[in-house]
Amino acid sequence: MNSMLNPNAVPCQPSPQVVAIPMQYPSGFSPGFRRQRNPGFRPMFNRRRNNNGNQNRGRQNRQRVQNNNRGNIRNRQNNGQRGNRRQYNQPSPNVPFEQQLLMMANETAYAATYPPEMQNVAPTKLVKIAKRAAMQIVSGHATVEISNGTEDSNKRVATFTIKVVMN
């Protein structure tokens, strides 16, 4: 009895308690079962996180569109169809969102009218400027007019006007 009361006398005394702990679980809820089930859930969470990233980006862009012009057709269309939002945001699921923006920016840059002072600017810079415009306007068509900014600073700033045609 004294050896059981004294923890220094028998150092191996707690080991039967450690062995007996898994018997407290019900048969269906053993920790091994939990360990087997977790890897099946991980891809679902990864997929959901990727979708949420795209949806958040689209939601931020749509908020900018809503602030720019209040009676937007796409916003009215999507109010009652929250479950099918992904189908409207991404017309082709194979093309990522940045690629769609780049394609839109290329079309916008080709449709833009440039003043003669800006003809010597590199086309990639014009596409970058048009990409900023395309990110602000996801729905509708935009033509970008680029003109030189103020001459006060030694750095020339290109300003652009976005014209939106709602249809």
Curated annotation (Swiss-Prot):
It is found in: Virion; Host nucleus, Host nucleoplasm; Host nucleus, Host nucleolus. Residues 28-94 are annotated as: Disordered. Its main location: virion. It comes from the Viruses. The keyword Cytoplasm does not apply. A motif (Nuclear export signal) lies at residues 153-162. Residues 31-62 are annotated as: involved in nuclear and nucleolar localization. Residues 51-90 have a biased composition (Low complexity). GO terms for cellular component: host cell nucleolus; host cell nucleoplasm; ribonucleoprotein complex; viral nucleocapsid. One of its GO terms (molecular function) is RNA binding. Keywords: Host nucleus, Ribonucleoprotein, RNA-binding, Viral nucleoprotein, Virion. Pfam families: Nucleocapsid-N. The keyword Ligase does not apply. Belongs to the torovirinae nucleoprotein family. Major structural component of virions that associates with genomic RNA. This is Nucleoprotein. It comes from Breda virus 1 (BRV-1). The lineage of its organism: Viruses, Riboviria, Orthornavirae, Pisuviricota, Pisoniviricetes. The gene is N.
